[in-house]
Amino acid sequence: MNKFLKLVGYDESKKTTVRTELIAGLVTFLAMAYILTVNPNQIVGEGSPYWASVFIATALGAVIGTLLMAFLAKMPLAQASGMGLNSMLGGIIGGWGGYGAQFTPGQGFMLVLISGLAFLLLSVIKIKGKTFRELVFDGMPLSIRSSISVGIGLFIAFIGFQNAKIIVDDPYVLLKLVDFTTFDDSTKNAIVCLIGLFVISILDKFNVKSSIIIGVVVATVIGIPLGVTNLSVLAGAGDVSWKFWENFANFFTGENTVFLSFTKVFTEGIAPAGISVFTVVMILITMCMIDMFDTMGTIVGCCGGNRILSDENNKPLNYGKIMIADAIATCTGAVLGTSTVTTFVESGAGVSAGGRTGLTALSTAGMFFLSMFALPLFAAIPSAAAAAALIYVGVLMMKNNVKDIDFSNTVKSTSAFLTIAIMVLSYSITKGIGVGMISYTAMSIMSYVIQLVKYAVTKKNKPTFEVSAVSIVVSVLFCIYFFVPAVI
């Protein structure tokens, strides 16, 4: 037993016990279990014939990714399909992502695989003692990194508002708030979502670690008398079954399995006709950037400042292995048929509960494995209830990152604002990042030139060039993406 515990880094000197580690793993699972329902909804939509396959892929991706954290990194961190990236993938597959065409599920997952392989290379290749990933991360301005997270948070919250029918179409002003006086299906969905959101917010105020999943469950129950929650799925209706072996059989061999659609890429190509190679490249760069920022921000947030989980320089222990585990998980998840698997900030719930080693991650992985056998329970959760989780995660992403935007600097604040606004209004994460990067680089260079001219005249306050090579290269690539049509 002791030999096994050492495999996951368990050591009593870290001021923990087996019981504490197992409970911490359960706490982490409860904090992030919402992803099992939200992810299929985001990628293929509620009621899709692919829903069950994506659910199983989501669970398996979380199991494998979290096991990598347990045995490779030996850290109390959990992985699953990342929020924001699943919305981006859903837009790519659904045709509403602003790329001019609808990708097949297999093509979408192939993009995820390639971005994962790129992230893995960035995590391994070193230049002057630093991995290429660290150099890229350090080369991106903090205001842009933070605004990307804020923008994604607002973006997925906006999707949640639409899924719950809180925000509906309007022929005159495009969008409007649902009319609560009609008490129609849209109103009922909105009420269910708002109740769930309020429950989550109140519970989180009192530090209830499983607030999100409790709020989703409460919203689901409220939806029963309102006709929003469809309980027929619990009786075996639709494409899911309590006979778990049937769900697994469908995942590997069924007509509507994403797992098999992935293999069609080798005969159908990586992108639809009419999509340029450069567009594909920019999608891959965007995926890689988001995964990089999410992962590095999460592990520093969960482990930094904790004397047991970080070194004397406040750098998380086993930092390199954490990044490699994250990259491998992304590749594995793509092959299974789910969006980018990344380290979850909800891992902090388990750390707060006393998790200190990979045994916590092992416990979380075990819970995700068991969840695959309860597929109908998760399938019964209506989109309106799951939307409450989407909106609240958006709140958290904004709260945790907006403070890092320097609003006293007009160049940084303007470029950050454009990143956030364009991301939401264009319904495209890629375009939001592109406009933000170009505006930051252009305004920074113009400001430097003006300051340089001023220095040449006054010989006072010599300016420093603050724009990194990474920012310039990324901005040039986005300029080509925006201004040069039909490249290759």
Could you say what each language-model-derived stretch is?
Residues 50-94:
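Active-site cofactor/substrate anionic-group-binding motifs, chiefly glycine-
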Residues 26-28, 35-36, 50-65, 148-152, ...:
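Hydrophobic alpha-helical transmembrane bundles of multi-pass membrane proteins
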Residues 65-77, 201-207, 286-294, 326-336, ...:
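Transmembrane alpha-helix interface/packing and boundary motifs in multi-pass membrane proteins
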Residues 2-39, 61, 82-91, 95-152, ...:
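Helix-loop-helix junctions within the multi-pass membrane cores of secondary transporters/permeases
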Residues 41-53, 91-107, 273-280, 382, ...:
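Helix-coil boundary and interhelical linker segments in multi-pass alpha-helical membrane proteins
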Residues 101, 105-225, 229, 362-488:
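Membrane-embedded alpha-helical modules
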Residues 1-54, 175-182, 216-320, 459-460, ...:
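Helix-loop-helix hairpins and the membrane-proximal interhelical loops
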